Regions:
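Conserved, charged catalytic cores of large soluble enzymes
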Residues: 233-240
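A glycine-rich, hydrophobic/aromatic-adjacent loop/helix-cap motif
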Residues: 265-358
């Protein structure tokens, strides 16, 4: 919500009617909108064109028309002379919204440019694992239904610092039982009903030990498993071996706490929140697949207050009745294959390989 005085913006606040944020701005946006962006002397208002060598800080002001025309001409020249695949488009989490993220993707896909895939150095393991299990990695939970959650299991995330909206409305206000699994006693963990402070790298073992308790205590949703789960019987021998005592030897978590967490989660409706930190370790993808057993075995998916949450995509949720209108994702099936972000330092050393890096 933009507040004006005498025709000038003087304050920007969050919209309390927004179905996901319910009002607060994240700290980054709050500081930006109400700080440097309001001070015209603290930010660029016009395009600047470099007039000297890189690093000399020599620029001259040009108009928007001049800037757009020159950029368009240079991209066109590169596409005609060297091929549009020599134009590289890189992006990351600062531009992951519907407009700021997907519109540039459409533009560069239309040009035939090469996308630098940021997830290859970051979140790809988690996305790939969840797609293997559920078919999709970003539409597993409708945030508007958080009020129905009876238990929220936060695994490898610290929303008190990195997700203030959901920390306030999901973890603090709705009365759900909060379980945090994290080697570090974060602020979120300290405020939780139960903190399982496992040894680093033993997450998959803990997931299997919890699955053992769920099966042993008759908490498997047999109807859901019968209708929607493939491969359960093949997994049973492994689950049966992973007792809470075995889990304690691997993770350092006492059996009683493993059992308490498993029962609370199975009781539901439960949300499984998988943080980015969880998959940024050796075998991170398989760790995600192990954790994904829990909603599959207990039927905690596809109903209000239940599901899995990992970097949910606003536009993707929209197609399933979520917080934004449905939006067609940009497709680049006919263009050049994306390149890994990890390969860019070497590629940038070859002027013939990269003609433009945006």
């Amino acid at each position: 919500l933009v507040h004006k005085r005498d025709g000038q913006i003087f304050k920007v606040k969050g919209n309390h009617k927004h179905p996901a944020t319910l009002g607060p701005l994240c700290p980054k946006c709050a500081i930006s909108y109400n700080g440097v962006w309001l001070d015209q002397n603290a930010r660029l208002l016009h395009p600047l064109k470099r007039t000297g060598r890189k690093g000399t800080g020599e620029f001259k002001r040009i108009s928007w028309d001049e800037a757009l025309k020159e950029i368009a001409q240079r991209l066109t020249d590169i596409a005609h002379r060297d091929g549009a695949d020599r134009i590289y488009h890189t992006h990351y989490t600062g531009t992951c919204s519907v407009i700021a993220g997907n519109f540039p993707k459409r533009f560069f896909a239309h040009l035939g440019a090469t996308e630098v895939d940021p997830d290859t150095a970051c979140n790809a393991a988690g996305h790939t694992a969840l797609r293997y299990v559920f078919g999709d990695s970003v539409t597993g939970f409708d945030p508007r239904t958080a009020t129905y959650s009876g238990c929220i299991l936060v695994w490898g995330a610290n929303p008190s610092h990195c997700g203030p909206h959901v920390n306030k409305h999901w973890l603090q206000q709705h009365g759900a039982k909060v379980i945090v699994i994290d080697p570090v006693r974060t602020e979120t963990a300290a405020a939780a009903d139960l903190h399982l402070q496992l040894r680093p790298g033993t997450d998959a073992a803990l997931a299997f030990a919890m699955a053992h308790v769920i099966r042993r205590d008759g908490l498997v949703d047999k109807e859901y498993v019968h209708d929607h789960v493939q491969g359960y019987q093949e997994l049973v021998p492994s689950i049966e071996r992973c007792t809470p005592e075995w889990g304690e030897a691997a993770t350092g978590i006492p059996p009683a706490l493993i059992e308490q967490a498993a029962r609370s989660y199975a009781d539901g409706p439960s949300l499984l929140w998988l943080g980015q930190g969880l998959q940024r370790q050796p075998l991170g993808g398989n760790i995600f697949r192990a954790c994904a057993m829990l909603p599959a075995l207990t039927g905690n998916i596809g109903k209000p207050g239940a599901g899995f949450y990992y970097l949910n995509d606003t536009s993707g949720i929209g197609g399933r009745g979520g917080t934004a209108p449905s939006y067609e994702q940009p497709q680049a099936d006919d263009g050049p294959a994306p390149v890994s972000q990890m390969d860019m330092p070497q590629l940038l050393q070859d002027p013939a390989a990269v003609q433009s890096y945006l």
